[in-house]
Amino acid sequence: MFYRLLFASLWYILPAYVANASACIFGGGTPVDLGKNFIDGRRLIGNGVTYRGCIFGILCGTLVGLIQGILVDFNIFNSLDFYGTVLDHVILAFFLSVGAIVGDAVGSFIKRRLNIERGKPAPLLDQLDFVIGALAFGYIVAPIPYEMIIIICLFTVFVHLLGNIIAYKLGIKDVWW
């Protein structure tokens, strides 16, 4: 029972994970805030959220939804029938992807208001901003039970910390967080 719930949770949030990662991988270029400052004199969002990253993040996350829909349509994962057709998967993935990008941007906005520089730690905000955005947008088209929300949040924090520790040990990151 738990493994089925865990798998369903990860299946649901996968497009958001891919959208968030793709935005980082393919990002760069013009920041969405166009270099503008907020009324407090600090940048609205900063250089970390760019148009290219947003577009590629949403496209890649939505593509994952298409692949998920095809896999379900071919009964490869027939136990996850509560998500519906291929089109349902694509629509959900689009909403999750947009939510992930918006959540990340909101997280950056909050960090700027708290005077936390880009790349500096903001515990839980750094790990969950995109997930909260994705869950909020995804809930519009495919609500999920609170157990899945808890699993997604806990899993995300765990994987984020584990990934950072591994990157630190490998010398890819300067800090473990």
From Swiss-Prot:
It comes from the Archaea. It is a multi-pass membrane protein. It comes from Methanocaldococcus jannaschii (strain ATCC 43067 / DSM 2661 / JAL-1 / JCM 10045 / NBRC 100440) (Methanococcus jannaschii). InterPro entries: CarS, CarS_archaea. It catalyses: 2,3-bis-O-(geranylgeranyl)-sn-glycerol 1-phosphate + CTP + H(+) = CDP-2,3-bis-O-(geranylgeranyl)-sn-glycerol + diphosphate. The chain crosses the membrane at residues 6-26, 54-74, 90-110, 124-144, 148-168. This is CDP-archaeol synthase. GO terms for biological process: glycerophospholipid biosynthetic process. Belongs to the CDP-archaeol synthase family. Disulfide bonds: none annotated. The gene is carS. It holds the Pfam family CarS-like. Catalyzes the formation of CDP-2,3-bis-(O-geranylgeranyl)-sn-glycerol (CDP-archaeol) from 2,3-bis-(O-geranylgeranyl)-sn-glycerol 1-phosphate (DGGGP) and CTP. This reaction is the third ether-bond-formation step in the biosynthesis of archaeal membrane lipids.
